[in-house]
């Protein structure tokens, strides 16, 4: 059977059309920090590569993208003034400190640039099972993926429990205007970060060696996250 063009797991985006109409967005900057929960370390390492692809996508779609280092410099200066909003032990975000820092960054960037919006690109880890249909596909946030296999061996153990949840990653995009009000948010699936371990007799998932290695999947996740 042919796969449907619309994936029912497509994320329900939020858009404030009135704010966007009142002040159209042309010039943006991609933040190097997360808006929500901190990304897992193994995903955080891949974030600069994903951000570079997001920047290319935005430029192709007619936006002017300011260098991330501009944001980073102002962010670091504001952190020196107000403290780090992220608790290094728990990874929790202090929203009050975060708001103070963002207000300072906004004020500084408004002086020196024609910035219209800040874009946050969080790599979020979710869970999905490869339990759908004979091909064992997982669907989440608009994508359909088949499982990866890792390690020596031939195929998947007959005892493998396809209902086990595997770690998957999505790109969460949040856009804030110069009033620091949310104008858009959505999420696009990228790929599973777990693979089926062929060395296990009963079958289990292990972390993939090559995380976010498929550029096409990243591009699809970006496209979905901006729609």
Where are these regions (language model features)?
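Acidic/histidine-rich, surface-exposed loop or edge segments in extracytoplasmic proteins
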Residues: 24-40, 83-84, 205-206
């Amino acid at each position: 059977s042919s796969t449907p063009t619309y994936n029912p797991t497509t994320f329900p985006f939020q858009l404030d059309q009135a704010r966007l109409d009142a002040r159209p967005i042309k010039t943006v900057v991609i933040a190097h920090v997360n808006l929500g929960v901190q990304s897992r370390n193994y995903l955080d390492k891949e974030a600069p590569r994903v951000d570079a692809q997001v920047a290319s996508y935005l430029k192709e779609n007619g936006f002017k993208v300011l260098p991330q280092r501009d944001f980073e410099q102002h962010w670091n200066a504001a952190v020196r003034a107000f403290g780090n909003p992220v608790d290094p032990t728990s990874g929790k975000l202090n929203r009050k400190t975060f708001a103070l820092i963002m207000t300072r960054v906004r004020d500084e960037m408004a002086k020196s640039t024609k910035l219209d919006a800040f874009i946050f690109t969080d790599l979020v880890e979710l869970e999905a099972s490869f339990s759908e249909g004979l091909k064992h596909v997982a669907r989440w946030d608009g994508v359909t993926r088949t499982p990866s296999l890792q390690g020596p061996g031939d195929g998947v153990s007959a005892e493998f429990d396809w209902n086990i949840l595997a770690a998957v990653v999505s790109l969460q995009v949040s856009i804030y205007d110069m009033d620091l009000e949310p104008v858009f948010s959505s999420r696009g699936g990228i790929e599973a970060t777990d693979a089926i371990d062929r060395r296990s007799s009963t079958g289990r998932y292990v972390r993939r060696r090559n995380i976010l290695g498929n550029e096409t999947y990243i591009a699809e996740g970006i496209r979905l996250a901006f729609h």
